[in-house]
Regions:
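Catalytic loop of the DD-peptidase/beta-lactamase superfamily, centered on the K-T-G motif
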Residues: 1-145
Length: 145
């Protein structure tokens, strides 16, 4: 299963995914969590059953991975009575590094493009209705100039 980058900070001994729930060990306990992101809204629900603790975070900023910082901080405070870790700082630094790497990769990709070349077809040539026997029809429309 593909896990969230925050696993680099929690360093679980085991991790799994089942029926919509990410699961891993956190501070010696099983943590189940589920995330959602749609239409500019995000959420995370985390449960440590053995500590009788659950955390729900809802926000109106898509891809705001601060939700992980809030969940782990709340778990530390309520399940383990521990306020020693600055989750906000750690997760901010982790994701800032990803944004920097993404910008560098884009710059490298543009620099490596073969000069004087272009796509085989114009962007508008991809417009149309496509059909798949299992998935049905999809309309592709160009929104670029």
């Amino acid at each position: 299963a593909s896990f969230y980058p925050t696993q680099q900070l929690t360093k679980p001994n085991w991790k799994t995914y089942g029926l919509g729930w990410f699961q891993h060990d956190y501070r010696g306990n099983k943590l189940d969590f589920h995330t959602g992101s749609i239409g500019g809204l995000i959420d995370i629900c985390g449960i440590i059953r053995d500590k009788n603790t659950a955390v729900y975070v809802f926000a109106n900023l898509d891809h705001a991975e601060l939700r992980h910082a809030i969940m782990y901080k709340a778990m530390d405070l309520f399940a383990f009575d521990d306020d020693s870790r600055d989750w906000h700082k750690e997760i901010f630094e982790l994701y800032s590094g990803f944004r920097k790497k993404q910008a560098e990769d884009l710059k490298k990709s543009k620099a490596e493009r073969v000069a004087g070349t272009s796509s085989t077809l114009s962007k508008n040539a991809y417009e149309g209705t496509y059909e798949h026997p299992m998935l049905g029809q999809v309309l592709v429309k160009a929104f670029w100039p």
